Amino acid sequence: HPSISSESQIILTLKILGGLSIREISTTLLKKEEAIAKAYTRAKKKFKAEEIQLVLPSANEVEKRLEMVLKIVYLLFNEGYKSSEGEQLIREELCIEAIRLNKVLLESALCNTPSANALLALMYFHSSRFNARVDEQGEMVSLEHQDRSKWDQQLIQEGLHYLSKASESDDVNDYI
């Protein structure tokens, strides 16, 4: 909601909808855990105090807010791609959810933008390497040492498809 700061929107969304912990959000945003906890509490209080209603934005507002939504989807994916806490190095369920959310956005003509397509391509390319990113001992494997035969070719093809769609425009964005 636009009456809440951008950072607070990110924090609320990652916490409430993404299910991330305050620690994970602080790592994601490169901020102190205490600062994130306070910002989360303030944003929740503001939401309740002002009785903010969540309504579907107008077409003009969708365009303005899409960049923030894509950033949140990216941050959710990023936390899954390299988990900041817990035993798992990769949390595939977060990555799958980020991809699902991005695909839902693309179903809307207003959200089917080069940025949204480029972000989905990026997520598919990264997801294609899951099977090669962790070795038998559970350690992270750098890109240069990954067994490329373990890369998921179908996900690479999906990535190429969305990269092609993103490239139909000359617009430069954060994900291409």
Provide a role label for each language-model segment.
Residues 1-6, 13-16, 22, 31-176:
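Amphipathic helix-loop-helix modules that constitute alpha-helical solenoid scaffolds
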Residues 27-29:
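Alpha-helical residues within the helix-turn-helix
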